[in-house]
Amino acid sequence: MTKPNGKTAFVTGSTDGVGRVVAKRLAEQGWRVLVHGRDQGRGHALLAEIAAAGGIAEFLPADLSSLVEVRGLANTVTEKTGRLDLLINNAGLGTGGPRAIRQTSADGYELRFAVNYLAGFVLTHLLLPLIKGSAPARIVNVSSVGQEAIDFDDVMLTRGYSGLRAYRQSKLAQILFTIDLARALADSGITANALHPATYMDTAMVRQSGVTPISSVDQGAAAILRLAVSPELDGRTGLFFNGQQEARADAQAYDAEARQRLKALSFKLGGLSANEYAAL
């Protein structure tokens, strides 16, 4: 049996693709891993693999396109564990390919914005008290080099929609959030960073987008794990990485006014209360 290290990690979107590999690797390193996904069969299959290798994991199902389920997921995490040393917001939707049509979440928001960005924003804020109580701790947001400036006049892309545009906007939103969060948590012992794990990994999401994979999920997992556990990242925060190299994101990520606009909008859309806002 793998020797437990006493730490707990929560990885969203970890029943498939790169998240699955990350969850397994963390379990191999002695982490207690909270696994998340929508598919019960995949979730329990992963638990069986981790248990067979001597690791410890639990499966927490939830559909991140529903903020009711996002809140339920946060409550479940809080009930399951008294500490959270690592949060990896990995769950997401791809571009949907060239024929993608505009879809909305259970709450009426553009689907990729809701799942790729807003769900992680809300989940992170709801889990902050738990994370703060476990400091030093890390938050890793899995983003992309595919980024497009947010149009604050049409965030939900009701005009000129494309799946690619929606995906790129949601991924940049993650980075604005990461930088803002890192600054808010300065001197708390919690770091927040974002990354593009690898280009066109061999995952179902990439293949469904009509793209030929050119990278392996192991490459992407290695980049995520470096941000998650490497001692060389101790104290480094508010950064964006392309693979394992620090990089510059789209210019909007470094615009303080844009970050504030997104934050205010996200608290409103996410239905976060003043007390939840004060968790920062």
Where are these regions (language model features)?
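Conserved glycine-rich Rossmann-like NAD(P)H-binding loop of the short-chain dehydrogenase/reductase
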Residues: 29-45
